[in-house]
Amino acid sequence: MEEKSMFGPENREELTTKGYTVVRDVLSNEECDNCIQQYQRWLQEFPQDVFPPSMHSLISQFNTGHMEPTWFVRLKAKSVFAKLWQTSKLLTSIDAIAIGRPPEDGEESFAEPNKSWLHVDQNASRVGLHAVQGGVYLEEACEDDWTLEVLEGSHCYFEEFFEGRQDAARISELNIFYKLTEDDVKFYGGKGCQKIRVSVPKGGIVLWDSRLVHANARPRKDRKHPGLWRYVVFVSMTPAHWASETDMAKKRYAYNNVVMTSHWSSQGVKTHGSGLSISGLPTKIPEIATTNEAKELAGMVRYDFEDGKSNGPQKPTWKASKNAITFTRANVYTVCFVLCQVLIVIVAYLFNLF
């Protein structure tokens, strides 16, 4: 599925300086609408008045990463990552989607001043650029809609931040994410990193450096387009030659067992199951994901790294972790936070059922 990439020098420059960039026209409006219709049909599989458990619009259960429209978007986004990494020999994440209901309907809350879940997805032992994450927007998102919020330029201070905060570095080694405290946000503010809500056109993709502080932002009251839903497919691809045999085995497991992964697509691959089940849950790979191209991206078919074509940049570096997990007050807080989020999702689901 070869597509012309709109990723250009200006996008590369923005990724380097700002930590994020927006690429237009990854999908046509018609393709976006077709995908939205498929997700809407999937939502109808739930009992009446039940919405799948989500966190800030993210739906990471139910094998959403293996749904047909998700794979369609993933394959369409490949050309962007191929241009970014300067190689077509890539591995993909099998990541979450986001479906955000309009707060105007009373089922979701609006954005609140000075309240967010700003975080980084890269742990302190990774040195430099290890991944570029992406979100393909099937609906337009203006600054006041459901969208991505970033601390612009914060990726430049990633190592400095963790060097001075050993508890934070230890927490990041849990390899989930590190959620910033108010004092952490002030650190980045002191470096001139402004909080920006990113506008993304329909069919576009927003890319961000995994060291960038970011979060999904809720819609603001009195927004320009009240009633607008959010539909986003998250995609991350990195050079295939970065992967170890252990990582490749995990990718094959994810594909063969129809389970999802985190955004780490080559190094440090993490898999997770489908969670709560419903009728319509993907239990087999959709036909669109059985092509040779899709199997290469999933790690099922190996690339030829000796064919004389570019394999992309060299493997990124790691530093030995000095941050063995200990039960400090800070990381106990983070573990409790994650467990609470899981409990909230389960309770919300059971509440909707009954």
Residue ranges with predicted function:
Residues M1-K18, R24-S125:
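Non-heme Fe(II)-dependent double-stranded beta-helix
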Residues N123-E143, S199-K202, S236-P239:
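Short, conserved beta-strand element in jelly-roll/cupin
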Residues A131, A141-V213:
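Double-stranded beta-helix
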Residues Q166, K202-L207, R211-T328, V332-V335:
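Non-heme Fe(II)/2-oxoglutarate
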